[in-house]
């Protein structure tokens, strides 16, 4: 198949060349929409479709009725009955830059003969899911269909009825006779990750991304399979509407608010904006929140809010004039896999790291990506020399999510997972039920020892400022440190012999080490690097037991009483304290002066927070996050990092995001910062 990513406009373009480009696009569309198995990143498809548009604009006599630019989507799958849409489900035009957005506004101005900056827009995140139509007749869900090719979709009613956040009956008296909801069905990241973990544990194929997972789940012929998948709907508009009781609002935003009031889920990030600067501000705000939303988005959707103006603007062949998708920089790109290196982590985990031909992804040059583990290498079928698809989302480490199979070179080289540690040459084993293979060398392995020391000094552990990764590596290379306790035995002369370490730098490092001696029990526990004991678990252990001695002597059953501690973590803790080397290091740290304040709980009558599970979210102005957490601990609370059905209170500061939304959905009691501060004052007064 020819590669058209470098297609250039010229005066000798032939119909044969154009048809080859169209065929390539059709092949990509078929794999994306029908097989749910994309061959190339969205960015590559976007580049090719835009090239085709440009060519057809320059040479309109070459446009054909079946060109990919002249239709919306893909054909329905043969396994589902077809549904004709009364109102076409069209796609949106894309904007990829501020210039594109400005051109969109100029087109509106020219069409309406008015200043587009005077228009109000309804702004929404662009969810990366599957567009659907859901029809309610007299308030009861009767029919659901995919978008398909825009005029004909697939009947997925049985599957949609299994999605928990879609009401089977509208929450209203006198419902409209016919109400068609248009929306996006997607899979939240937490559910997607859990689904893939279950699949890998069973030896089944995992999904490349949440969109593929949502599409595959929605197109199951057995609704019982769909029922087990964590799908959700966010409505973004209304299609057919017939009612003898009420007229719809003439504001798109107000229509979405009305949908929410009758039980239809609507995205929590939807806002109104007026004019170019506010549209850019919304785009920037959503882009900044992207990594924390809990679901995949690939841009924003900007719609003229006034329905009357929408109707005046109307449509072009395949999209409305009154809306545009302003997309984020591509998070997926193609590049060449040059080699694979195997790294050893703090707990001995062997991680394959892909060495890539450097390429720009989401504004950052990427030359390394994770391949996770041996199962992932096998699932991808990837080889050295392959053209691979890499994905970078937010601050997540770039990963390879697929290969372009038809571009594999003849000299591609198979990736062989090591059976011996690449650092200490100890045996590599994989425990049954785990995806990760591990070096058995323990602290004999220099790589594990180095990573354990880096973890010990890190910000969320002992927070030793000025002692970073490079200094740890130098200290180990000179054999000045072997265990965390050795850090507290360093002297100025030893440090001054190191590279870029003068007298002042050495003293600053020693001052930081001295300062770190006063810590908290939770930080100290976390710094020890006990496997599966993260920051939150360490905090829960400290709050529950109150002292290190109590934690050291607790048995498995006592440990399991702690929130978030199950059988596996409890056994890891018991095993850690049974290892005399670990006990010796801890005792040496305490002998070197590491200490912490006792955890004191305030004894207050009628304390509504005692023994409650509390989650903090958003930005607090009257307290730092650590101050708020400490106050809650003193009041006898269990402070968690995630909202769940076990959460009793959510304390929400400014710019609270998905945790607030989830708490509202679960009916959890919510305190804003002022209410929290008032409660603290009241309890302190009592």
UniProtKB/Swiss-Prot annotation:
Pfam families: BRCT, DNA_ligase_aden, DNA_ligase_OB, DNA_ligase_ZBD, HHH_2, HHH_5, Nlig-Ia. PROSITE patterns: BRCT (PS50172), DNA_LIGASE_N1 (PS01055). Zn(2+) binds at residues 421, 424, 439, 445. One of its GO terms (molecular function) is DNA ligase (NAD+) activity. It catalyses: NAD(+) + (deoxyribonucleotide)n-3'-hydroxyl + 5'-phospho-(deoxyribonucleotide)m = (deoxyribonucleotide)n+m + AMP + beta-nicotinamide D-nucleotide. Its cofactor is Mg(2+); Mn(2+). SUPFAM superfamilies: BRCT domain, DNA ligase/mRNA capping enzyme, catalytic domain, Nucleic acid-binding proteins, RuvA domain 2-like. The active site is at residue 126. GO terms for cellular component: cytosol. Keywords: DNA damage, DNA repair, DNA replication, Ligase, Magnesium, Manganese, Metal-binding, NAD, Zinc. NAD(+) binds at residues 42-46, 91-92, 124, 147, 184, 303, 327. HAMAP family: DNA_ligase_A (MF_01588). This is DNA ligase. It comes from Haemophilus ducreyi (strain 35000HP / ATCC 700724). The gene is ligA.
């Amino acid at each position: 198949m020819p590669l058209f990513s470098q297609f250039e406009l010229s005066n000798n373009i032939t119909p044969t060349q154009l048809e080859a480009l169209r065929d390539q696009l059709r092949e990509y569309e078929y794999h994306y929409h029908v097989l749910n198995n994309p061959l190339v990143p969205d960015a590559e498809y976007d580049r090719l479709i835009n090239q085709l548009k440009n060519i057809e604009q320059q040479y309109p006599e070459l446009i054909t009725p079946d060109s990919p630019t002249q239709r919306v989507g893909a054909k329905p799958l043969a396994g589902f009955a077809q549904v004709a849409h009364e109102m076409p489900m069209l796609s949106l035009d894309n904007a990829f830059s501020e210039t594109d957005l400005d051109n969109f506004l100029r087109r509106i101005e020219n069409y309406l003969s008015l200043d587009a900056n005077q228009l109000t827009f309804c702004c929404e995140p662009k969810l990366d899911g599957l567009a659907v139509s859901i029809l309610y007749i007299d308030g009861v869900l009767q029919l659901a269909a995919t978008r398909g090719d825009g005029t004909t979709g697939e009947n997925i009613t049985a599957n949609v009825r299994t999605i928990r956040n879609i009401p089977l009956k509208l929450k209203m008296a006198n419902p409209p006779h016919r109400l068609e909801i248009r929306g996006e069905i997607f899979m939240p990241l937490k559910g997607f990750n859990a689904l893939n973990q279950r699949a890998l544990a069973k030896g089944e194929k995992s999904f490349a991304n949440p969109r593929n997972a949502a599409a595959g789940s929605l197109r199951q012929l057995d609704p019982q399979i769909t029922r087990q998948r964590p799908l959700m709907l966010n409505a973004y508009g209304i299609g057919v509407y017939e009612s003898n009781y009420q007229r719809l609002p003439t504001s798109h935003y107000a229509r979405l608010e009305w949908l929410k009031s009758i039980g239809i889920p609507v995205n929590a990030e939807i806002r109104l904006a007026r004019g170019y600067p506010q549209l850019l501000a919304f785009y920037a705000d959503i882009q900044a929140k992207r990594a924390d939303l809990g679901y995949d988005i690939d841009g924003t959707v900007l719609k003229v809010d006034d329905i009357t103006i929408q109707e005046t603007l109307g449509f072009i062949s395949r999209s409305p004039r009154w809306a545009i998708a302003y997309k984020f920089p591509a998070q997926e790109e193609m590049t060449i896999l040059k080699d694979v290196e195997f790294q050893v982590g703090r707990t001995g985990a062997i991680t394959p790291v892909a060495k890539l031909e450097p390429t720009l992804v989401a504004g950052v040059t990427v030359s390394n990506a994770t391949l996770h583990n041996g199962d992932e290498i096998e699932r991808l079928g990837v080889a050295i020399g392959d053209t691979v698809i890499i994905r970078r989302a937010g601050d997540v480490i770039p990963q390879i999510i697929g290969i372009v199979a038809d571009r594999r070179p003849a000299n591609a080289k198979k990736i062989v997972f090591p059976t011996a540690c690449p650092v200490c040459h100890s045996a590599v084993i994989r425990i049954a039920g785990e995806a990760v293979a591990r070096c058995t060398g323990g602290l004999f392995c220099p790589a594990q020892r180095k990573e354990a020391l880096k973890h010990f000094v890190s910000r969320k552990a002992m927070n030793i400022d000025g002692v970073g990764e490079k200094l740890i590596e130098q200290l180990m290379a000179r054999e000045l440190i072997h265990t965390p306790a050795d850090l507290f035995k360093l002297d100025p002369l030893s440090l001054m012999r190191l590279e870029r370490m003068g007298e002042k730098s050495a003293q600053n490092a020693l001052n930081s080490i001295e300062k770190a001696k006063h810590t908290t029990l939770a930080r100290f526990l976390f710094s020890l690097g006990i496997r599966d004991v993260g920051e939150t678990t360490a905090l829960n252990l400290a709050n529950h037991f109150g002292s290190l001695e109590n934690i050291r002597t607790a048995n498995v059953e006592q440990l399991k009483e702690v929130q978030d501690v199950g059988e596996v973590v409890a056994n890891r803790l018991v095993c850690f304290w049974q290892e005399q080397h670990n006990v010796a290091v801890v005792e040496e740290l305490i002998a070197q002066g590491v200490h912490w304040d006792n955890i004191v709980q305030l004894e207050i009558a009628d304390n509504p927070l005692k023994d409650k599970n509390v989650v903090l979210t958003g930005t607090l102005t009257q307290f730092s996050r650590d101050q708020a957490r400490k106050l809650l601990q003193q009041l006898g609370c269990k402070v968690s990092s995630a909202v769940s059905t076990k959460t009793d209170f959510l304390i929400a500061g400014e710019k609270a995001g998905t945790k607030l939304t989830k708490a509202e959905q679960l009916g959890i009691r919510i305190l804003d910062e002022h209410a929290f501060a008032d409660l603290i004052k009241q309890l302190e007064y009592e």
